[in-house]
Amino acid sequence: MIETLTNFFITSALVLFGIAFIIGLFRLIKGPTTADRVVAFDASSAVIMCIIGIVSVIYNTVSFLDSIMLVAIISFVSSVSISRFIGGGRVFNGTNKRNH
């Protein structure tokens, strides 16, 4: 009984996260502004991390946790880079001094 409920909830979570990913992907492609695309990319990468976590639970392994960490790092670095580009127009300024 409990295993049936667990399978139902895991399957439902995968379906709902899949729908959320499709919606985020649509906003990523169709977003009118760059800020919309950045938010959609962050949301999509969070959904991907959740899907990988659920797949890790299904297969009863911790091997997928490294890929969750990799997706999180790539998402963070890309969000910071795009935010700096939107804010000032340059991602790297070529000097070691910070502008305060």
From Swiss-Prot:
UniProt keyword Transmembrane present: yes
Statement: the UniProt record of this protein carries the keyword S-adenosyl-L-methionine: no
Bilayer-spanning residue ranges: 6-26, 38-58, 62-82
Subcellular location per the Swiss-Prot or TrEMBL entry: Cell membrane
Membrane-related topology note: Multi-pass membrane protein
Pfam families linked to this entry: MrpF_PhaF (PF04066)
InterPro entries attached to this UniProt entry: MrpF/PhaF-like (IPR007208)
CC per GO annotation: plasma membrane
Keywords linked to the UniProt accession: Antiport, Cell membrane, Ion transport, Membrane, Transmembrane, Transmembrane helix, Transport
GO terms assigned for molecular function: sodium:proton antiporter activity
NCBIfam families: PRK12657.1
Family assignment from sequence similarity: Belongs to the CPA3 antiporters (TC 2.A.63) subunit F family.
Subunit structure: May form a heterooligomeric complex that consists of seven subunits: mnhA2, mnhB2, mnhC2, mnhD2, mnhE2, mnhF2 and mnhG2.
Name listed for the protein in its UniProt record: Putative antiporter subunit mnhF2
Species in which this protein is naturally found: Staphylococcus haemolyticus (strain JCSC1435)
